[in-house]
Amino acid sequence: MPTLLLALAVVSTGLYAGFMLIFLTGIMPGLARLTDEQFVPAMRRLNETVPRGIFLVVFLAEVAFPAAALAVPVDGRTGTGTWLVLAGLVCSALNHLVTITGNIPLNNALAASEKATPPAPDSEVRTAFEAPWNRLHLYRTLLAAAAFVLLVCAALL
């Protein structure tokens, strides 16, 4: 069971890190090429679509499985392996902290701007959203990648 939990931690964290990397290197650069009038509604639709279903499962699993792997005692796990799993869990938890305290409030402000009366110009909405969101997303991507590497290292011990 402990080996399975660590394997699930590696897989879920790897899936999450890959998703973050695709957003960082493909989706956001693609959206950056859009006009303000195209970018703002496109990002709103992404924010409505992404945090559901499979993504939500992976988002939760990338913290739950490392925590479970750490909680279950393992015969023969070295102190180094335990510390690597703990470090991976800390990176995943910090990733969630950035998401919950940074990206989600920006997403919520973007959604609220659609209903504002009078609505703010898309150029102002984009300026308030894009650079801060991208900066926070870079942090999330780096934390997710670090968590993945740390958990892979723990699994290889």
Locations of the language-model features?
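Interfacial segments of alpha-helical transmembrane regions
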Residues: M1-G14, V74-L94
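Hydrophobic alpha-helical membrane-embedded segments
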Residues: S12-I22, S92-N103
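Interfacial loop at the N-terminal end of multi-pass membrane proteins
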Residues: L15-L60, A109-E130
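Membrane-helix exit/interface motif
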Residues: I27, M43-R44, I54, A64-G76, ...
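Internal alpha-helical transmembrane segments of multi-pass membrane proteins, especially GPCRs
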Residues: E48, L86, A131-N134, L138-T141
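Core segments of transmembrane alpha-helices
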Residues: V58-L70, T141-F148
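Extended, charge-rich alpha-helical interface modules
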Residues: S92, F148-V149
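Juxtamembrane boundary at the C-terminal end of a transmembrane helix
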Residues: L151-L157
